Amino acid sequence: MKDKNIKISGNFVRIHLSGSFLKFQSIYNLKKLYLQLVILTIVAFFWGLLGVIFVQFSGLYDIGMASISQGLARLVNFFITSQNINVDSATIFNAIFWLTQILFNVPFFIFGWFKISKKFTLLTLYFVAVSNLFGFFFSYIPGIDNFFLFANLTTAKDGGFENLINEKGVQLIFWEKSAEKQVSLLFYGLIWGFLQAVFYSVILIIDASTGGLDFLAFWYSEKKYKDIGGILMLINTVSFIIGYVIGTYLTGSLSVQSYVGDDKHQPFGVAFFLSPNLVFTLLMNIVLGLFTSFYFPKYQFVKVEVYGKHIEKIRNYLLDNQQWFSITMFEAEGGYSRQKTQVLVTNCLLIKAAKLLEDVRKFDRDALFSITFIKKLDGYIYDRRTNKQTKHGTENKS
C-alpha cells in the first residue's frame, strides 16, 4: 500500500487525514428505488420484531400515533380479560396494537401527499404497512409473550395487589415493588430508544418516515429549518401521554377499584400515573430525540474552509451546476513556507458539506477541507431549490 505521508523537510511530515462527515454516509448515495425498498424492508423487519419484544409485552409505549393504538389495544384487552368475554383476546389485542396504526395513518398520508412529496408519502406508506404486518405476525410466535431479555415483567412475586393487576392483563409496575422489574424496564427503554434512533435515522435518510405525527414533524422541520430530533421529542411526548392515559393509567385504576389496599395505590392516584412505565418511556423518547439529531443532523450548520490551488475551478463548477453555496474567496499566505494559497469559505448544512467535498475532490485531490460546527447563526444561507422548497436568502452571516 502506498504511504500517503510524505516527508517534507527534517522531521516535518505531511499527513493525510480523512473522515466521514455523516453517519451512514453510504445510505445517502442510494438513489435507486429498489435499493431503498430493500433497506426499508430490512429496517421494517427488525422494527416489527424488536417492537414485540421491547414494547408490546413490556408495558412501554412506542413513538407517535403508535402509542395511541397501543393504548387502545391495552384498554380493549383489559375489558375482555376483566369481563371474561369469550373471544380470541390475543388476536383482537394484536390486531388493534399493530394494524390500527395503518388506518390511523390515512389522514397523514393525504397530508404528506399534498404538503411534502409523493415519493416521501409512498415510501412511508410502504414502511408503515410492512413494519406493522411484521409486528403483527411476530406477535404470534409461541411463547413470545413470556420472553424477556431481563426480569419477567408480568409475574408478581408477592401476590396481592400486583398480582391482581397482572391477572387482568394490565402491564404496570410500581416504584414500591420489585426493583428488579424497574431496572429491567429502564434497560428496555434505553436500548429501544437507541435502536429506534438508528432505525429512524436510516428511514429519514432514505426520504421516508415511520408515519403518523412524523408527517407533521417532517413538514415543520422542512418549513422552518429546525432540527427534527427536538420536534420529534415534543410530539412523541404528547401522543405518548394520550396513549399511556388510555392504556395504563385508566386500565390500572379500573383493575383495582374493588381492592382494599394502602393509600399509596388508590385508583387514579399518583402511583398509577407517575409509574416506571411513564418515566422510562419518557426517558426512551429523550434518548430517541438526542440520537436522531446525532445520526441525522439535517439542519446542523457548519463553516467550511477549502485551502487549495484550484479554487477558481471549483467556484466555476459550483456556479455552472447551480450548487447554491454562498462563497467567500481570498488569498492567504502560509506562515511557514510563505507560499500563496487560495481559500474558499462557505456556511452550509452539514449534509451539503459531504456533497461539496465530492465536488472539491474532482478538481483538487490535495486540497485541505476543514469543517467547523456553528452553534448559532443569524442571517441567510443559500439552499438549492427543489419541488418542495423555494430558494432562501442572499448571503451568509455568522
Swiss-Prot record:
It is a multi-pass membrane protein. The chain crosses the membrane at residues 37-57, 92-112, 122-142, 186-206, 228-248, 268-288. GO terms for cellular component: plasma membrane. Pfam families: DUF2179 (PF10035), YitT_membrane (PF02588). Signal peptide: none annotated. Keywords: Cell membrane, Membrane, Transmembrane, Transmembrane helix. It is found in: Cell membrane. PANTHER family: UPF0750 MEMBRANE PROTEIN YITT, UPF0750 MEMBRANE PROTEIN YITT-RELATED. This is Uncharacterized protein MG432. It comes from Mycoplasma genitalium (strain ATCC 33530 / DSM 19775 / NCTC 10195 / G37).
